[in-house]
Regions:
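Juxtamembrane intracellular "pre-TM" segments in multi-pass secondary transporters
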Residues: 2-14, 190-221
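C-terminal membrane-cytosol helix-exit motif in multi-pass small-molecule transporters
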Residues: 176-195
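Pair of pore-lining "gating" transmembrane helices in MFS-fold secondary transporters
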Residues: 13-40, 217-230
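Short amphipathic helix-loop junctions that connect adjacent transmembrane helices
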Residues: 36-50, 236-252
Length: 258
């Protein structure tokens, strides 16, 4: 990786960016794979209703939103690595809980626990710790690309994996991906010698109120919230429409997403 002025990232920076991008990708792939299949396969769970299936699809977002800033702040005090490691273990535990569930409530509990592994802020902070200022934009762009690619891949892999292994098997696969991400953190990602304060990742408690009242950010936050709500709602309606209106068996939905 190199910038427009020809100065290349160091080997350590490249390893950090690649490792953290993989951690992000495996975590997000595991999170997204369930989206195109839960509305159809989830109907076989005890107590399942369209509303509760929708709750299961979006439940992770609630705990993730609530815990994202606290986890980021915690990483300033105890270090990035411990927060990321614990977050991945919590995410894996949530996937394991959902994999063993035989009711929709068990899946909801697992998804809530998955969202509690909110490591995004800590990962971005560690990325800032491990890269120089002139390379930080490129590093964050790589992370962004890994998220986009994992979403696209999940739309195909999710239906295929569920067809092969069932919904429980899909959650076990998600658990395995989280543990693989943990191995990458432990074996590939360099250790930061110091925990620095960065404008990209720092939380200033005294500014939270001002930030929440900022009109431009309010419009942005509401717009993004509506966008995500529509996206999650589409994964409740679209798979069912493909089966009931389109006559397409749920085992073949991956063709549509491909």
């Amino acid at each position: 990786m190199h910038d427009l002025h020809g100065e290349r990232m160091s080997a350590r920076e490249t390893r950090a960016v690649g490792g953290l991008a993989l951690v992000y990708a495996f975590r997000m792939l595991g999170m997204f794979m369930v989206l195109p299949v839960l509305a159809t396969y989830g109907q076989d769970l005890a107590g399942a209703t369209p509303f509760l299936i929708g709750v299961a699809i979006g439940a992770y977002g609630l705990t993730q939103a609530v815990l994202q800033i606290p986890f980021g702040t915690l990483s300033d005090h105890i270090g990035r690595m411990p927060v990321i490691i614990v977050g991945l273990l919590v995410f894996a535990a949530g996937a394991a809980l959902a994999a063993q569930a035989d009711s929709i409530w068990g899946v909801i509990a697992g998804r809530v626990l998955q969202g509690a592994g909110a490591i995004s802020a800590a990962v971005m902070a560690l990325l800032s710790d491990l890269t120089r200022e002139q390379h930080r934009t490129k590093a964050m762009a790589v992370i962004g690309m890994s998220i986009g690619l994992s979403f696209a891949l999940a739309m195909v892999v999710g239906p295929l994996a569920t067809r092969a292994f069932g919904l429980s098997g899909l959650f076990w696969l998600t658990c395995g991906m989280a543990l693989l991400g943990l191995l990458i953190v432990l074996l590939m990602v360099p250790r930061a010698s110091t925990t620095l304060s960065h404008r990209e990742s720092k939380v200033a408690p005294q500014s939270i109120g001002v930030t929440l009242r900022n009109p431009q950010l309010l419009r942005l936050n509401i717009g993004i919230g509506v966008l995500h709500a529509i996206l999650m709602a589409s994964f409740i309606a679209l798979p069912l429409a493909l089966v009931e209106q389109g006559g397409l068996p749920k085992e073949q939905h991956w063709w549509v997403y491909l």
